[in-house]
Amino acid sequence: MIWHVQNENFILDSTRIFMKAFHLLLFDGSLIFPECILIFGLILLLMIDSTSDQKDIPWLYFISSTSLVMSITSLLFRWREEPMISFSGNFQTNNFNEIFQFLILLCSTLCIPLSVEYIECTEMAITEFLLFVLTATIGGMFLCGANDLITIFVAPECFSLCSYLLSGYTKKDVRSNEATMKYLLMGGASSSILVHGFSWLYGSSGGEIELQEIVNGLINTQMYNSPGISIALIFITVGIGFKLSPAPSHQWTPDVYEGSPTPVVAFLSVTSKVAASASATRIFDIPFYFSSNEWHLLLEILAILSMILGNLIAITQTSMKRMLAYSSIGQIGYVIIGIIVGDSNDGYASMITYMLFYISMNLGTFACIVLFGLRTGTENIRDYAGLYTKDPFLALSLALCLLSLGGLPPLAGFFGKLYLFWCGWQAGLYFLVLIGLLTSVVSIYYYLKIIKLLMTGRNQEITPHVRNYRRSPLRSNNSIELSMIVCVIASTIPGISMNPIIAIAQDTLF
């Protein structure tokens, strides 16, 4: 009799939970429609992989790319709608979150064509690769709209788990296994630090988990200036710092960049920074509203260290991927300036604009590296010597992307940095802007050093890799070159296109 009653109670409780979940999905599901499209694409990929004996590679890529494009389209149709909070306060949709979701979808859409020939040449499992990329994209999108501490913790873990698997995807490569182990250990440590910071925030606010409710809780408990909030700020900054990889939280970046497959590095180098930047702006701006001076100081220190160390160490690198790793550390220092400025003086707008240009510049550079690596089998900088004599198109594309990363006019990177530094100067961050200008000059030096190698015609400097260079006859090259062309064009657009981009970015302020 007792067992029968307990069984009935269990069934009733399960039914209530199911009905509540169904109610949430029915009434709030439209607010995560872009994410649902990607989930449907994931299910479709799994069904095809489990029912088909022979893998139809073009069809798998078509499904992945189509789901991403459809998700972008649904996101654009929702633009300028009223901000809404759904799923019992766990998720928020507004223009600010959606622009970051758009950037993540754009990254994934451009990264998938980069991986076509690479996966074929390395004989990697195609379906699993696409599943991990789409799942990481979903995790990044949920992180952009996360409105409570639990979702802010779970969403990046979804992204991180897929990132660990992608970085170790070439299991026979010792460097890839080493990169995965370092990435996993550092990621686990940072997650524990982050959740410890959340526990301090949760306790200080009186048990609140929603971001705005945490602010109200801190006011009610009079704990907004307590030592507990300072401890929470330090731990959360360290935890988020791992995702952004500024100095001194950058130790994992060079090894993971060098050991991971190049298309994976291209994906991680942009999506992780976009998602982490979106999360950082909301966490610092809302729960730590009363501690703005403290987190401004912390981020200023991180920005200075990142810009100086990242660009100085990049000069000494001999591997193209390690050089780009340290370059990305310097680039995130520039992005942090926009986070510090905030919604005043167009700080967020300048950060979004620069990140859009950074996506095109960085992915364009990695597209060139993928092509060169597949045709020569090397990633050393010195092996690029004389590439212009064999493949002028690839050499010029790489040169334009590198010059744009350095911020030379009239390329897109120059106008992005100009807008970012101008907003920082208007906000009174004179020292940060001066450091940014000086380190930008340093970055131009090592970018020009590579371009000089590309254009050299001396036979004694040209390595056997370039002497024996042959353009691959495979048709799949067209997808990599298509992504490269799109990124190069976006990296070289003139300043005349800046006004509409800035106007769109300014509309995202919450």
UniProtKB/Swiss-Prot annotation:
Keyword Mitochondrion attached: no
Keywords: Chloroplast, Membrane, NAD, NADP, Plastid, Plastoquinone, Quinone, Thylakoid, Translocase, Transmembrane, Transmembrane helix, Transport
Biological processes, Gene Ontology terms: ATP synthesis coupled electron transport; photosynthesis, light reaction
Keyword Transmembrane: yes
Spans traversing the lipid bilayer: 24-44, 57-77, 99-119, 124-144, 149-169, 183-203, 227-247, 295-315, 323-343, 354-374, 395-415, 418-438, 484-504
InterPro entries: NADH-Q_OxRdtase_suN/2, ND/Mrp_TM, Ndh2_N
Complex formation: NDH is composed of at least 16 different subunits, 5 of which are encoded in the nucleus.
Protein family: Belongs to the complex I subunit 2 family.
Entry-linked PANTHER family: NADH DEHYDROGENASE (PTHR22773)
Name of the protein this chain belongs to: NAD(P)H-quinone oxidoreductase subunit 2 A, chloroplastic
Record organism: Lactuca sativa
